[in-house]
């Protein structure tokens, strides 16, 4: 999957919920070198970043060994040879799922469950070559317009929203044929 789409649908919502932040305080920054894995800005403006080689072995290893840090057999990041680190704001026209993710996180309720279910169904259809890559955000938005958002949901409400979103994507694709 493309990184900004993945970041929009997963990371914005996870950070917002995990740290109990308003969605306006969670930013996505495009960093093509994939060396800065996370960044926290403090109230005083200071920032702390976690840097590493551009692969997922380290975070996966840490997930399995937490709260300890296991020694890595891999070569560590060398700041003298890794090159420049660049950052830019995402283009919300180029990455519409990021805009959708922000709207859903702000809406609350089952909106994120609808978004996630619709995205998973749309990506599955893309991988089956039944829809184009650029159809994914349109299918997600269509599901969001067709499935009612419930506020203060319980687990059955969330699971039902996911099911309805997946069905809405399949119905929309069926209507396109």
Region roles according to the model:
Residues 1, 10-177:
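Catalytic, metal-anchored helix/loop core of enzyme active sites in primary metabolism
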Residues 4:
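Cationic, low-complexity basic patches in intrinsically disordered or flexible, solvent-exposed regions
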